Amino acid sequence: MSRIVSVGISEFKIASAPTILMTYGLGSCVGIALHDPVALTGGLAHTLLPAPVRGMDSMVKSAKFTCWAVDLMVEELIKCGCVAERLVAKLAGGATMFEPQHRTTHSGIGERNVTAAKEALERRGIPLVASDTGDDYGRSLEFNTVTGVITVRALQRPIKRM
């Protein structure tokens, strides 16, 4: 039986098989999953914002920011015996949650989160093998560290497995 570990907003968790990493309520936030299929170990981050604003660069790095989450997870995965070259990534979330008339100058966070995640993965040389991003609805994720499969659930949408 798999144990279930919940990943909150601005957090990441690392786990070995058999574990299901879960996160709920991804709107404009992004869920980034990294998996080593040999070590059967993975990480899941629930990031809130693409990057810190100017002047915050010196703060302690956290998974709150998409630009840092991949590096933080890779460091921890390596400590757990994973090999960076074996890691693969899956990405979900990054929705546009408001109608055009209700958007502000801070709109586009979802799209910017997705871009920041892809840039961080590319910088690390980690292939993005599947994604379910954008659109206008929230998602919840279940990441199986044995199979590497992510189950994406959304209201009134078919369940997706990637």
Curated annotation (Swiss-Prot):
InterPro entries: CheD-like_sf (IPR038592), Chemorcpt_Glu_NH3ase_CheD (IPR005659), Cytotoxic_necrot_fac-like_cat (IPR011324). The keyword Hydrolase applies. HAMAP family: CheD. Transmembrane segments: none annotated. The keyword Acetylation does not apply. Probably deamidates glutamine residues to glutamate on methyl-accepting chemotaxis receptors (MCPs), playing an important role in chemotaxis. Keywords: Chemotaxis, Hydrolase. SUPFAM superfamilies: CNF1/YfiH-like putative cysteine hydrolases. GO terms for biological process: chemotaxis. This is Probable chemoreceptor glutamine deamidase CheD 3. It catalyses: L-glutaminyl-[protein] + H2O = L-glutamyl-[protein] + NH4(+). Belongs to the CheD family. GO terms for molecular function: protein-glutamine glutaminase activity. Gene3D superfamilies: 3.30.1330.200. Its EC number is 3.5.1.44.
